[in-house]
Amino acid sequence: MTLEMRMVELETRQAFQDDTIQALNDVVVEQARVIERLQLQMAELIKRHEEMVGQYGSEGEEAPPPHY
């Protein structure tokens, strides 16, 4: 294998690796966006849950059923 052929092979591999790295980076960026949205949704759900518990009292504060 000549030096020129080796250079072409290495440049070709690098081009494919660059494409793969970019594709993986795109996936990571999208996953980060999804995680951020999920964190915001989770925070909103926690806030709603705390508001509901505040309105209706916690489960530990319930009076025992009438048959006790």
Swiss-Prot record:
InterPro entries: SlyX. Gene3D superfamilies: 1.20.5.300. Belongs to the SlyX family. This is Protein SlyX homolog. It comes from Pseudomonas putida (strain ATCC 47054 / DSM 6125 / CFBP 8728 / NCIMB 11950 / KT2440). The gene is slyX.
